[in-house]
Amino acid sequence: VTEFKRALPNAEIFASSNDQDVKCHTRISQFAIERAKRLVECGEHVFMLIDSITRMARSFNNTSKNNATMSGGVGVGALEIPRRLFAAARNTRTAGSLTILATALIETGSKMDDLIFLEFKGTGNMELVLDRKIAEQFYYPAVNIFKSGTRREELLLQSFQLDKIHMLRSE
């Protein structure tokens, strides 16, 4: 957080550290998204980084008052607010835009983490998968190009770039 504040002096940084209680995590999450929405309404283009959506969802799960649980120990309705927060990303025609980039914990061995990931996987429009084996070989960024991609990538890339990516993925 300190490094972000130093590197981005004009940015608003909202953070909640591990030593704070879950109510603080949920309160900051909701405050940050509401602030972002107001800026978009004023015509600003906002970029929000959520690290991690898994931890944020866990916090909302821990503050959930519902005793009924789904598989993985996630409370019924516990993901409703995190889903709404993540769904706030948009590009408006008359005002600004809100882009949300969220990290997710995967392959942790936790059924809850798997359920949270699957809940948000279909909501996003791109997925960037990092690979530990690539990082161990000191290649950075350690992106797994076979598991990474975006919806409608043909709108972002020139045809020759898209052809090369498809060729790489087919190998």
Task: Give the residues covered by each predicted segment.
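P-loop NTPase catalytic core
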Residues: 1-171
